[in-house]
From Swiss-Prot:
Belongs to the ATPase B chain family. F(1)F(0) ATP synthase produces ATP from ADP in the presence of a proton or sodium gradient. F-type ATPases consist of two structural domains, F(1) containing the extramembraneous catalytic core and F(0) containing the membrane proton channel, linked together by a central stalk and a peripheral stalk. During catalysis, ATP synthesis in the catalytic domain of F(1) is coupled via a rotary mechanism of the central stalk subunits to proton translocation. Component of the F(0) channel, it forms part of the peripheral stalk, linking F(1) to F(0). HAMAP family: ATP_synth_b_bprime. One of its GO terms (cellular component) is proton-transporting ATP synthase complex. Its main location: membrane. It is a single-pass membrane protein. This is ATP synthase subunit b. Pfam families: ATP-synt_B. One of its GO terms (molecular function) is proton-transporting ATP synthase activity, rotational mechanism. Keywords: ATP synthesis, Cell membrane, CF(0), Hydrogen ion transport, Ion transport, Membrane, Transmembrane, Transmembrane helix, Transport. It is found in: Cell membrane. The chain crosses the membrane at residues 25-45.
Length: 186
């Protein structure tokens, strides 16, 4: 500071230590202008380019994220649709199986009823055949017994077989009709 005072005393003017000399101001303005031109010409375009690239990447990332989200949403909807279709298919298969089971059950019941009816009919036919066989055997047995009893009662031989057979048949027919009227024997 002493130097400024000495210089100011020599020049004869009052020098303010806060205000620089004119040549310093000129050179400072020139340096600032050069730096501004360099910044404007080189630094700012590169900075703008980097910022634009970064913004593009961010926007591209956002677009990709939106596309991925839309694709994920579409995939989710397809999955839900497939799941709903699978549930409908499963319900249809269950219903088909239930219907088929009912048809099989009805068919088995019908077959069982037919088999039962066949067995009952065969049983009735067998019973009727046995009844007819027993009746035939009984008629001949009753006929012989009647002839034997008649011979014992009369004391002589009844030899006319045609008359014997006709008499026995008439007697048995009357017996059958009287049994049928009463409901006995059947």
């Amino acid at each position: 500071m002493y130097e400024y005072s000495v210089l100011a005393a020599e020049s004869g003017e009052d020098v303010n230590p806060l205000i620089p000399a004119t040549y310093d101001i000129v050179w400072s303005v020139v340096c600032v202008a050069i730096i501004a031109v360099v910044f404007y010409k080189y630094v700012i375009p590169r900075l703008t380019k980097v910022l634009n690239e970064r913004a593009d990447k961010i926007e591209g990332g956002i677009a990709k994220a939106e596309a991925a989200q839309a694709e994920a949403q579409q995939t989710l909807e397809q999955y839900q649709q497939q799941l709903a279709d699978a549930r409908l298919e499963a319900a249809r298969i269950r219903e088909d199986a239930r219907t088929q089971g009912q048809q099989i059950l009805a068919q088995m019941r019908a077959e069982a009823q037919a088999e039962s009816d066949r067995i009952v009919a065969a049983g009735h036919a067998q019973l009727e055949a046995q009844r007819q066989q027993i009746l035939t055997e009984l008629r001949s047995e009753v006929g012989r017994t009647a002839v034997d009893l008649a011979e014992k009662i009369i004391g002589q031989s009844v030899s006319d077989e045609a008359k014997q057979a006709a008499s026995i048949e008439r007697f048995l027919s009357e017996l059958d009709s009287s049994d049928a009227g009463i409901g006995v024997g059947r």
